[in-house]
Amino acid sequence: MEFETLSDMKRTNMCGELNASDENKEVVLMGWVAKNRKLGGVNFVTLRDRTGIVQLAFNDSTDKDVFEKSEHLKGEYVIAVKGKVLRRTPENVNKNMPTGEIEVFVTELRVLNSSETPPFYIEENIDTNDALRLKYRYLDLRRPDMQKNMMLRHKVTKIARDYFDANGFLEIETPMLTKSTPEGARDYLVPSRVQQGKFYALPQSPQQYKQMLMLAGYDRYFQVVRCFRDEDLRADRQPEFTQLDMELSFVDIDTIININEGFLKKVFKEAMGIDIETPFIRMPYNEAMNRFGSDKPDTRFGLEFIDISDEVKNCGFKVFSGAVENGGSVRCINVKGLGNKLSRKKLDALSEYVKTYKAKGMSWIVVEDDSLRSQITKFLSDDEINSILSKTDAVPGDAILIIADKNDVVYDALGNLRLEVARQFDLIDNSKFNFLWVTDFPLFEYSEEEDRYVAKHHPFTHPVDEDIEKLETEPQNVRAKAYDIILNGSEIGGGSLRIFNSDLQERMFKALGFTHDEAWERFGHLMEAFKYGTPPHGGLAYGLDRLVMIMAGCDSIRDVIAFPKVQTASELMLKSPSYVDKKQLEELGIEITVPVDDGEKENSDNE
């Protein structure tokens, strides 16, 4: 087939824009062929662009050349057409298409390019493995659901820029090549050719730079910024990701929260037409853990924790009494009305499930009309059983699922059990968007791997004022001026008020196990800057990918990122990372010490 050019042909409309009000209008459309079907003496071609689809009609009785050319059109051919918009007859209206009231009667057709048969259908909800989709990502991105996701992402960032600009924020870019200050996830390192033996790090966040901007007097800053973390991937993690980042001077927590509730209210209304209620619930960290076993609770459903430690602390069942005696707890959830759906097989499966989270197993009591179904009631007295039933408000049809262990194990295991039960029994209302703030976090958490306290958020978080005196003596009891914004059980953003005094910052580093010299080696630039009139300041950063993922109703952030990585941190379309020339390594003063055989290199190149 001979291909043509646009020449003097100029597009007048996008495919998805047309409707009955355009009747008799002459239009020029361009896009991809989605379908081609013949009915009598008419060819019907569905034309697609990013705005949607429209039906084209080619009639052999009016222009045989154009009609014959249309017969050879195949899926994903790129074409341009000129024609007239006609209203469909009532019986031919397609109510499933936004453009279903009209069709375009084509008088001129230009075939701009052909296409091989794609490896998967270019349509919504395809059943294709992710590796194939990502290898041919340029085709995957043509699919309507992916294009909707990308357009939603664009809307969110556009609304963010408008909102923060209107609220006095300046958009300022911070460096991509910065200093490695390892504390938390691993850095991606970039070797310096000019200063051999030295490395830049790609930023895990713009944290220190945005604090410097507050020192510099810019008052309110924001940025849509790429960040990098060399860590193991999950469904909602990528090695490179996007933050909507902000920092403010001379503010308290209420001011930061109010500004961000205003932003979320605006973005949901303008991007999705959804009204969300503000202010959001604020829940202290300890309350979140005691009620849900999580610092990012999903509040779209119940199944809240019930502490039955007092009811069983003296019982004959050593799993329970021993847990309480050793400083742990016994907690449960009441799965109301679903006891008859929890067979012994399902209960055993759930018991195995919690072992993933270091629990030794799960106990249960299923309340039936005239009896109890349980593997533990034989170890409990009637009074203890009645106390449990009373505390859990259990009635026939309910199932009480119980975990006993150290508190951190109980929180983790029962919290994940709560989510698993909700998923299995469809207890989650996916139409809801439930926001809340989690506040009053611990400043530190203990790392058994490192045998020291590490920062719960980051080492620049300001302690609660009345807890500062405990930094050296009771670090486990120091609270942070920190806050996370939670949506449907996912942390979509987090922030804090920052330390703005060099002496307090040095005390913080000491509590984290840094010597004076180590602290100044890594962060001396910040503590030096604090000597020159630092204002009180604080901020917040959203995980933009995760926020858009939830808004779009996707299961993975890969579906809202144009060119994501897979779990091996590979990008399958361009096949990165890749080997580089020996000459490039020599220029950097780098020698590869890990042997790579030719077969492995060839396989990597052909992934």
Q: Where in the sequence are the language-model features?
A:
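Class II aminoacyl-tRNA synthetase catalytic cores and aaRS-like
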Residues: 1-607
